[in-house]
Amino acid sequence: YVSWRIKAKDPKANIVVTPSDAIVLNVPEFRRVITQSLKFTSETDAIVTLGIKPNRPETGYGYIQADLSTSSPRNKEIFRIDTFREKPDLETAKRYIQQNNFFWNAGIFVWSVSTIVNAFRIYAPAISKVFEGLLNVYGTDKEQEMIDKLYPECEKISVDYAIMEKAEEIFVCPADFGWSDLGSWSSLLMH
C-alpha cells in the first residue's frame, strides 16, 4: 500500500524498509551503507537487501547466499543474490558462517518506488491490482475507507515470499554496523 501511496506523491522516490525491532550500534556505517544502496537503486531497476555479516551460527535468522564473484559494475560492495535460505538448524548455520558468502537476512530493503510497484505487478498481480485500483483515492477523504474495505482482499504474504525470492534483479549489500534483531528478551539482554 505505502509504495503506491508514495508513488502517487513522488514517482521517482526511493524507499528504505526496515523492521522496527532492531538495534543499530554503528549509525555512521549504517548511514553509509543505506546511502550507497539508495544511490544504486536510484540508478537501476534493482532491489537491494542488506545482508548482515554473521558473527555466530544463528538458527533464528534467515540467510542470504550471495554470489561474491559478480559484484555490480556500479558498486563493488553490492552483489547478486544466489538464493534466500530459511532459518537453518545449528549444523547448517555453522556451515554457512564458515563460508564468506552467507549473510543474515535483516529484512532491510532498499528500492525505487517504480521498481517495487513493477515487481508487485509481475510477481503479485492480485495485490498490485488492489492498490492500482486506488490510485484516484490516495490523498483524499475516501482513502482510509477504501483501504479498510480492500486491504483484507489481499493475499496474506510477506514481501520476502511475494517479491524477494522471485525477483531477478535482486542484490545484497553485505554490512556490519552492529545490527541485532531485538525480537526476543534474550537478544535484548545481549545489548
Go through the PLM ranges and name each one:
Residues 1-70, 118, 122-123:
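Conserved beta-loop-beta/alpha segment of the NTase-like Rossmann-fold superfamily
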